[in-house]
A protein has these predicted regions:
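Aromatic side chains
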Residues: 201, 251-254, 289
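Surface-exposed acidic/polar loop and edge beta-strand patches at domain peripheries
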Residues: 1-182, 194, 205-242, 257-340
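Short, acidic/polar linear motifs in exposed loop/turn regions
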Residues: 190-192
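An ectodomain-focused feature that recognizes extracytoplasmic/extracellular
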Residues: 247-261
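Surface-exposed beta-strand/loop patches in extracellular or lumenal glycoproteins
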Residues: 199-205
């Protein structure tokens, strides 16, 4: 049964107390109206217990914002949620529309640093987060008498003439009274030849989850700093500090130990506020994990990023013989749970 305001309620008890379920929780759809954001569609989801998040069909069904009782879970950048028409796929152009948010998807043909591969140029993190969705549907319904489901689903396609034809369907779901959400992806190669498939969930936690009073808790059995800068503070990868102008980003590659159910749970906990956020995902789907730690003023964010391949360029992955391929007609699924603690 849904738990609202500290009490469990049956379906009938809730029906008697409101004219429609939207009074308690549900989805509102609207478009942003100004500047680079004009025309961006948002599905604003409320679960009824203070947990709220925004899914953007215009931006790969990614999660542009999330909060709990008015406290943000994620970092939002200065770019805003730019309309995908402004996407610049060359070099670092991806950053001009990187709004942060609770989830930005990287892939699907490439991710990591810009590169050249077989005469093709691939920009930073590829175009997944800039793919607009079609067949967008909203579900708000009871599953029996015990669970009221709230979900948004849409389908994106990464394709071109003489190129890949990949269909990607995403469902973002929660339930009335919940303090977490579930992202489920189904990716199908509808072409007739194999194609690369790399996917990384760029989950961007921000203030007040991220603060000088926060710690990162994760089942990391090995931490490999990306470079010399990260190596200088590798011993304190799990501690955060106050934001300061000019601090460089630090990235760490973790080897995670899944639990008895094959799941990995990572979380950030603000010890002073006794408030935080978590992610949980199947290790078999995402055997690689990157931590993006930046305490630069204005870019105060800690990214927790599971992926299906090492985080490096497509060209490097190919050279390492580590580039995942999706065969013609093959389907692959990925999922993650994100929520409040």
């Amino acid at each position: 049964m849904p738990t609202l305001y500290g009490q469990e309620y049956t379906k009938e008890e809730l029906r008697r107390r409101c004219g429609q379920m939207g009074q308690l929780g549900g989805v509102s759809r609207y478009e942003l109206q100004e500047g680079f954001e004009k025309g961006v569609e948002i599905c604003d989801v409320r679960t009824g217990n203070g947990f709220r998040f925004c899914v953007s069909p215009s931006r790969g069904m990614d999660i542009t914002f999330a909060e709990h009782n008015g406290r943000p879970l994620c970092w939002n950048s200065s770019t805003g949620v730019r309309h995908p028409a402004y996407y610049n796929e060359t070099n670092l152009g991806w950053l001009h529309g990187f709004y942060g948010g609770l989830l930005t998807t990287c892939g699907l043909q490439s991710y990591g640093a810009p590169c050249e591969d077989d005469g093709e140029s691939y920009g930073l993190h590829d175009r997944a987060s800039y793919l607009p969705a079609t067949h967008v549907t909203v579900t708000e319904e009871w599953n029996g008498d015990d669970e009221y489901e709230i979900a948004v689903e849409g389908t994106m396609r990464q394709t071109r003439v003489f190129g890949p034809n990949v269909r990607w369907t995403r469902r973002v779901s929660t339930t009335l009274g919940a303090s977490s959400l579930r992202v489920q992806d189904r990716i199908v190669n509808e072409g007739f030849t194999s194609t690369p498939l790399v996917i990384l969930y760029h989950c961007n936690f921000g203030f007040p989850v991220v603060s000088e009073n926060s710690i990162i808790r994760a089942p990391s059995v090995h931490c490999d700093p990306r470079d010399d800068i990260a190596a200088q503070s590798a011993a304190t990868w799990d501690r955060l500090e106050e934001p300061q102008p000019g601090l460089p980003e630090r990235c760490y590659f973790h080897t995670m130990q899944p639990d008895e159910n094959g799941l990995v749970r990572a979380e950030i906990w603000n010890e002073k506020l006794e408030f935080g956020a978590f992610m949980r995902y199947p290790f078999a789907q995402f055997p690689y994990f990157t931590q993006w730690k930046t305490c630069d003023a204005g870019t105060y964010v800690n990214g927790l990023e599971p992926s299906n391949a090492p985080l490096t360029s497509r060209a490097d992955l190919k050279e390492m013989n580590a580039l995942p391929m999706l065969e013609a007609g093959e389907e692959r699924s990925f999922e993650v749970e994100l929520g409040v603690i």
